[in-house]
Amino acid sequence: MGKYHLLLDCSYIREIPSSPVSVFIYAGRLLQGLRLSTTFDVTALVCKGLDDYIDSLAGYCVDKIVVDIQDTVTHSIALDRLLALIPFDKELRRKHIDVVITPHHIESRYFFPKRYHHHFIVHDLIYRRRLKEKTHKWKYACISLWRWILFRKVRYFISISEETRKELMKLKKKDSDVLYNSIPFNFQLQEKPVESVCGRRYILDVNRFELYKNAETLIRALYELKDQIPHILYLKGYNHFPQDLMYLQSVVSELKLKDRVIFDTSNRTEAEMRWLYTHADLLVSPSLKEGFGWTPIEAAVLKTPVLISNIDVLKEVTCGKLPTFDPYSVDDLASKIQSILTNPPSVEERETLAALYKEKYSLKGQIDGLTNIILKHLKEENDGFRR
């Protein structure tokens, strides 16, 4: 039997971002891995004008179907989505597409007919909280009902963690398979020093500057320790939420920590990010909520000591191997930081943990898992058809 033809729906990428976006990187990783697949030939669905950007994410010239997302069948995008009508259906048939994957379910423009075995990948459902906070309750109810109607049409969901799977089941009453992320590092790449912290001891946090990422607790923990440790706090993120960043900066000013805290919103290269990880005395991940949590694993793979908040998803994806703290307690975080800085894990412990995560979160493992999930669903449909 020949290969299946898989369409990776990248139409949720509608502009070239000013800074890296994790769900865009995720699509690039899938394209990189699927290129080597012996099961699938892959085509990307790409918005007009973004051909080169998608190629840069994938690292090669991807086979593409290029679309204008304003094109419709019924003159209504909403009706097209409701009826699963695709303006480029002839192109899908010409390429003999068997399976469609949408790597980011929230921004999905297209809902594909049943014959295309459409799979949605769910990273988290945090958008519901954001929407509820910023929208009048009646409008929120209407939007929620509309999304519920659309998502009932999707047969296959894939969650990036068991915790996301549970949340999807609770909120959408939809079960899903679990497929973990892979580590997006090129381990052959030489590190490039970040001059602003060369020769300085620092604690690192790599996250968006959004309040639920909980950098405030980390800042306040540093304040508790400022006379006991020499470290600065290096907060690496992006200015996607300016009000939240301004609030965090005001906390630093209030505590008179401006000389001890660095906010870095620049576009660091992968070589610079690797340097930041490997030269930190400690990476702290203080999040109150995550869909997966890449950064603790990235740091541990690079053999940096790591401390994580005790939320279930971080304990899940780190296999219960990392020390934890109560993310609502400044005192607990300060105590745990001081303990690890005083008694860091041994070189042997770090190497063992790095090897574990590097194998568990390999690109090959991710693509093998995705392949098994899709083949399982195709078999279930074929068996059901025969019956």
Which stretches of residues belong to each language-model region?
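Carbohydrate transferase catalytic cores enriched for Leloir-type hexosyltransferases
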Residues: 2-387
